[in-house]
Each structure stands twice: as structure tokens, then as C-alpha cells.
Amino acid sequence: MARKGILGTKLGMTQVFDESNRVVPVTVVKAGPNVVTRIRTPERDGYSAVQLAYGEISPRKVNKPLTGQYTAAGVNPRRYLAELRLDDSDAATEYQVGQELTAEIFADGSYVDVTGTSKGKGFAGTMKRHGFRGQGASHGAQAVHRRPGSIGGCATPARVFKGTRMAGRMGNDRVTVLNLLVHKVDAENGVLLIKGAVPGRTGGLVMVRSAIKRGEK
């Protein structure tokens, strides 16, 4: 079976009750509808993938190369494009150009991997960014409480090693959370209720894919 995936929008978090009346924290994801605009094959492209398009956009805002691609696929222009990698044998049999994908491709109780862009935190110090302990709060410490301390030797090695954890921009990274449980699929509203937290801000773009390290339940 081909790996399944869909683009969607994170709508926020809420809580629901399961069959045992226990509270379950869930993230609400508006999944799709997506449309297949291109199928990559090993013979032509060197790998197998399916290209998904999602979100409304004015045709005036789409450049000519993408307009031609949408026209060839016979679909209206969309705001977002993303590729879902597949096994070599899956692309031609499971998907067709112009096919529409909705939240119903997933089932209650299945496991998914969710990819999104984490919230940007701006310029952050080492205590917030890397969890450094910091320095003394008293006993003669003067204005060094949140400083990182030494970042390297002087004469030897006379440089700062690459990868040294220092202050800098934090967040706004591509993050994937693995093996999240789909608590419920609301096919009528095109919504997935995913147990736990999902990367990114409310209103952010996410990709929901069937879990790669866990088989279908």
C-alpha cells in the first residue's frame, strides 16, 4: 500500500473525551482537500513521488510556469505545493493526476507523522535556546547570570569550534513529530483530531503522512 499524505492547516488545540470518559488533548487539523498535480516516476525523474496542491489562490498571483503545470493537470491554481515520496512501485498504481484527496484517507486509530514549521522565538540566549544552567545568582557574580561562559581556549585551540552552542535565532525550523495517534476523523468537516501537539502556529501549514516507523493499525 502506498504511503498516504495530505496537506492541511493547523486550527489549534482542544480536548475531547474517549469511550472511558477520559480527557484527550487533541490538535485540530483542517486536512485538504488536496489535488494531485504531478506524479514523479523513477524512469523520468529518478524517484517516485506524488505532488499535492492545497489552498485557494487568485490565478493572477501564480507565475507562468506554475500556471502551465496546473493547466496541464486540469486543476485550478492552488497556494501550496508539496511532494509526498513513495516507494518505486506505488506512484503509478495508487494515484492519478487530478485525483482529490480528503481527510478520509486516514482512519480512526491510525498513526501519522506531522511536519510543520515551529514557532519563531527570535534571538534567544543560551539558557532558553539550549537549556544552559547559567551562572551564579549571588556570591560575587556581577551581570553574568545568564551568560554562556567560556566558548573556547585562548592560545589553544585559538578558535571557536564549529557547532558550539551559542545564542542566536531560535525556532522557525522544519519539525516532524512521529507516531501521533489519529483520535478521530471528521469526514463531514474535513478535519483530523490528532492526539497531542503538532508543530507550528495556529493557521500554519502542516503535512500529515502515514507513520513511516509504524505500520497501519
From Swiss-Prot:
Pfam families in alphabetical order: Ribosomal_L3
SUPFAM superfamilies named in the record: Translation proteins
Gene Ontology terms, MF aspect: rRNA binding; structural constituent of ribosome
GO CC annotation, single: cytosolic large ribosomal subunit
Entry keyword annotation includes Ubl conjugation: no
Keywords for the protein's UniProt record, in alphabetical order: Ribonucleoprotein, Ribosomal protein, RNA-binding, rRNA-binding
UniProt cross-references to InterPro entries, sorted A to Z: Ribosomal_uL3, Ribosomal_uL3_bac/org-type, Ribosomal_uL3_CS, Transl_B-barrel_sf
One of the GO biological process terms: translation
Matching Gene3D superfamilies: 3.30.160.810, Translation factors
Subunit structure: Part of the 50S ribosomal subunit. Forms a cluster with proteins L14 and L19.
NCBIfam families documented for this protein: L3_bact
Family as reported in the entry's similarity comment: Belongs to the universal ribosomal protein uL3 family.
Function according to Swiss-Prot or TrEMBL: One of the primary rRNA binding proteins, it binds directly near the 3'-end of the 23S rRNA, where it nucleates assembly of the 50S subunit.
Name of the protein described by the UniProt record: Large ribosomal subunit protein uL3
